Amino acid sequence: MDIELTKKDGTVIKLSEYGFIVNDIVIDSMQINTKYQDKENMNGRILMGSNYISRDIVVPCFCKVKNRSDIAYMRDMLYRLTTDIEPMYLREIRRKEELNYRFTQPTSDDYVKLDKNNFPDYEYSRHDQQIYVNGKQYKVIFNGVINPKQKGNKVSFELKFETTELPYGESIGTSLELEENKKVGLWSFDFNIDWHAGGDKRKYTFENLSKGTVYYHGSAPNDQFNMYKKITIILGEDTESFVWNLTHAEIMKIEGIKLKAGDRIVYDNFRVYKNGVEISTETNIAQPKFKYGSNKFEFNQTVQKVQFDLKFYYK
């Protein structure tokens, strides 16, 4: 078991590579904030709404040292690796099956080989290798205080993280990588992806059409400005009023400027661009939104091309 931390500068850290053994990875469900309102002379209360706030992730781990004088060194190294004040991405790593090793009849010449962390280095099968459990990552920040607990030459720690901007798990890959079948290792079984050739659930680029359907795999909707999505549209006709819609979004409009066939319109979260120049003030501010399953889209003209580049989010 292990965790992988990707820092803001691109540095990638696995605790096992520094001599720390992870006991468990506890990913809590999301904290929910529910608001109610009381009414005078009314029994009960009125539900005003709920929203997800954050998620806690706890990672108990330990290290063993040859000499007790090394304890301070290992302790300070763990602090340096994990206690950043900037967000980082966390991935979960586990073995596919319970660890097994080959039993042999010992002889007088036998010895146990040790790895670089002084743990027995048994001859494992390929099923004993540690793997990423899924294609999700969590944007987290270190939260809390580490209190080392020493017992002999073993020191135990508990690392506490919490999600920052979003409480959701985020797909590492994008819809375009999924469509192009790139980096298959980015995806996992729980994403429920249809890998058959030509499957509609992996199609995110469309040409010469006025309406169609795009599939969103995430269990949490991609409906906020701080969720990754970029919709690129190549217009097929000259117009001064371009209108389109998605199943779960408000009608999106661009009006008051001249648009030509071949113009490249990009919806980059809450900003809109025409051929690289921002035109957000010429829109009705509505943004694309996607929910699990099929999301129908329709334009008021036949566009040359539309491409949906987005990430999927999970509860």
Indicate where each model-derived feature is located.
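Short amphipathic beta-strand/extended segments with alternating polar/hydrophobic composition
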Residues: V12-G19, R102-P106, S125, Y132-F142, ...
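Intrinsically disordered, low-complexity segments enriched in serine, threonine, and glycine
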Residues: S171-K315
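Short beta-strand and beta-hairpin "edge-sheet" elements
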Residues: P87-Y168
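Oligomerization/assembly interface segments of phage tail-like spikes and tubes
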Residues: G44-D70, L78, G152-P167, N295
